[in-house]
């Protein structure tokens, strides 16, 4: 029954929208621009329609990451740091971005830039697709610093830096003889308060588990076992052993509130932005509220535990993975990595990031495993969970750097290695590989790395197919300004062939 339910949902994909060739920015449409010569009712070209769709996607992603940092600042009662991008970015890049008009105009203007990006894509505003593409890069930079960097830095300051440890993961971490509480989403504020509660000796009957990026964050910082990535969140509830699923923001499937109705599970929403039918809404805005809500959740979960059906069992085994790396605790220093690259002992660094998209059937994990003989691998997000499940996160060739916002750690690793090599980032053999994107956030993260001068691979069409004129334009524009490339390669074999033939530093430059 559940399988059919999911299959039916997957059948609802629009093949035209998938390529970005549908404009629904006004009510003269929606208009389809299947061919290059097609125009929308207002005269918008295919290039304009596709570029506007990409920008709206990027704006969605940037708003999520910048919102994450903003919520954390508000929670901590802190102000935005002054001149943040200037402080964090390499100076040559800061000057380049400034020269080409990619920086927010003033303090706090980054949210205005996201809003202006939406404005520029409304019907009858910007008709220059080249300028629309420029906006994508601008929002990528905002996402990188006012989202990824700031959220990571604040959380590290308050909740501590991760530590290298062996973590447990998979549905097997759910304990049949305990009250199971899952924390799910991206902003681990309440999850941190729950950890403190759960570690009190009167709460030894509680088993706290993580899902999605909140799960990655608490796994890396505290060793809280991780039950599932985005793709498996429904399976967590379907075990029938979850008393409460506590969600914050982003990547929380609306389906879970329906699914929870079939079990005894209580869904608890904890952020003003995220409400769900049939859920208990307990928003938190400060530390005191977080502590009180954490306390209430535990007693609510215990009550729900009385309704759990008897004799439930978990069939899946636990997996283990080495987690908890960050930019300063990799086994090799930036200088050692730079030297290995210079001496050709290492062909480069590949960061595998992003989601785990069920529509992608190709076996990227197998390819990464093969390539790890020659390349050092970093990973974050849901795809990191997939690599862990395949047994690759042994702390030798693959290094797990946390959640989606922790892509800031990858940017830092790249910056530090390039600095140690006395080169600019675009001179180094670095690659971002996002084989299975789902969320808009994967696209804005990609735009950020492209603006840093790192090549970005997507393994799934993101409103763009490689034969389109706009894809070629994006390629050229990036090459000219940032010496980087965003490219699509859906076939692992083809990807490997290109990599082996020419290597990272030359093929994609
Ligand atoms: S949770 S953005 S499905 S990685 Fe960060 Fe996973 Fe992608 Fe959400």
Task: Place the predicted regions along the sequence by residue.
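Anaerobic metallocofactor- and corrinoid-dependent redox/one-carbon enzyme cores
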Residues: 2-509
